[in-house]
Amino acid sequence: LTTGSLAGFRGAEEIDRDRVLEIETDILYPAALENSINDKNADRIKAGIISELANGPTTPNADLILFEKGVKVIPDILASSGGVIVSYFEMVQDSSSFFWDEEGVNRGLDLKISKGFRSVFNALEENRIHSRLAAMVVGVARVAEACKIRGWV
């Protein structure tokens, strides 16, 4: 890139930025702005799956619209949780002075992400709710269990 932009790239079709989210695609990865999927454009989303890489890219009203349309959403708190998980691994390693190799970190990350996804998917199926609400249900249940184990409640 010599122009600093993709605009005018030879052989590419230029698309209005407001229509990018409405392109027909299997998976949509909103990765930049909060509230970019909202009640004004959610009904025009053509993706079958949305994996939220940005923080809060979908508004609550859009969540409901997408759920009613049958669009599968992997909410931001699940899709972008890898960094937080690995930060936790770093804290655990530092506190115990026992350090893992890259393979061990990746294996642990895979286990945590897979378990989280299964938990959210199960909550979604059992309660017939949208995925963000399912993720919140799982999260609140885990915090409640941790508080109970610690004798706080």
Which residues does each PLM region occupy?
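A structured beta-alpha segment of the ubiquitous adenosine-cofactor-binding alpha/beta core
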Residues: L1-N41
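Adenosine-phosphate binding glycine-rich loop
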Residues: D43-V153
